[in-house]
Amino acid sequence: MKKYIMSIGICLCMASCLNDGFLDVDPKDRQTEATAFSTYDNFKTYAWGLYNIFYGYGNDQNMNYFEDEYNADNMIRAVSGFESQYAYQTARVEATDTEHWDYKYIRRANLMLDNIDGSSLTETEKEHWRSVGYFFRAYKYFMIMSDFGDIPWIEHVLTDESPELYAPRDSRDLVAKNILENLQYAAQHIKAEGDGENTINADVVNALISRYGLFEGTWRKYHGLQDAETYLRASVEASEKVMANYTTLHTPYDELFNSEDLSGVEGIILYKKYETAQLCHGLTRMVRTGESKIEMTKDAVDSYLCSNGLPIGNVNSQYGGDKDVYAQFTDRDYRLYFTVCPPYRVNLTGAAATSTGYELTGNAQDEQFINLMAQISGETYHRLPTLNFKGFYVKEQPHFTSYNWSTAWNASEMGFWMWKYYNIHTDCTNATGVNTTDAPLFRLVEIL
């Protein structure tokens, strides 16, 4: 009997040891926190997912890119049901806002930050990845705070029992202060060159401090809040650091928004890369069809300076006046011409809806901006006359929708067709979005 008892005891002991060992083994078919955050490359792989916060030109073909603008006063979308919800007083505050009040991304950043100290990284490497995590978390908090003001500040991954789930919102003062402190830490401790080309580095962090400090500083100044100078000073200091490393602006201006490759382009600090069959957008195609219905307002056009740098209301601006669109566009800042299509007229050599050829009219006014755009824009960028996504010419701008030329594309209700993202070199054949022009995220011109 003793033999049996001893044998059972030995088996139980061995089974206990085996079970303990089995329970301590990490699964080999999926990542856990213990395996996902161990080496430098682990953190690098995880951090790639955080870059998805940059919207760029969006994915596929949708109009979300312009939503903030046509809900403001710079643009309209001439489609029933898409009028400015603020101008028409139809805006509603939803009880649950999953688009803006979204802490899932904060949790993703906190998950990485919580696992840095327990990793096998060197202290310098830990500082780098802590800086990357701080950058992305601050970027998201900046977005949420700008919408809501007072919000909860969460620094660690929460559980179902975490008291923070039921805590009141933290003050804007606290959140704003924490955002700035996180970014300033990141600027001091991140690897200067980041993790290679087009990754978060010291210049990108300082570019965000510049943007954030200006926003928060001016908000506080004009809303009577304290510490405005703290944020404005931080913006200036960060801007100066960026300008020390970036000294040249790229020209022509329109290439910044219509290039297939922004790597190495002067003044581009960070951009979103698009690649065929991997990540595409439909912005260029929408501009070259009748689908977007996006156009600029007269107020937005009037905000552009004249060629001598003066606003149109200045007596010395030499503004041509409002007698016709040619006068409105003469001697203006070139950025207007790259954003709103200048006026022109040609004679088509084929049918109005399918002409692949044209002839000049011989009228100097009709050809004024055809000649100018040929001088200041590249061959496949903002040249006149314009082409739709199938390569058919439009005979005239402004092309009012009321003209009923059997061509709905490149048209507008008010005469100011927005063509900033127009080019004829990116693929526009597919309505699901196959455009691959890169989207600038941080530019030197914003810092200046």
Residue ranges and their predicted role:
Residues 41, 80-82, 89-97, 251-444:
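Elongated scaffold/linker segments in the mid-to-C-terminal portions of large proteins
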Residues 1-15:
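Sec-dependent bacterial lipoprotein signal peptides
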Residues 151-172, 220-233:
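Short coil/linker segments at helix-helix boundaries
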Residues 17-64:
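Membrane-proximal, proline-rich intrinsically disordered regions
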Residues 38-58, 78-148, 164-197, 330, ...:
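Conserved, well-structured interaction surfaces
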Residues 145-146, 150-152, 194, 212-224:
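Short coil/turn linking the two alpha-helices of tandem helical-hairpin repeats
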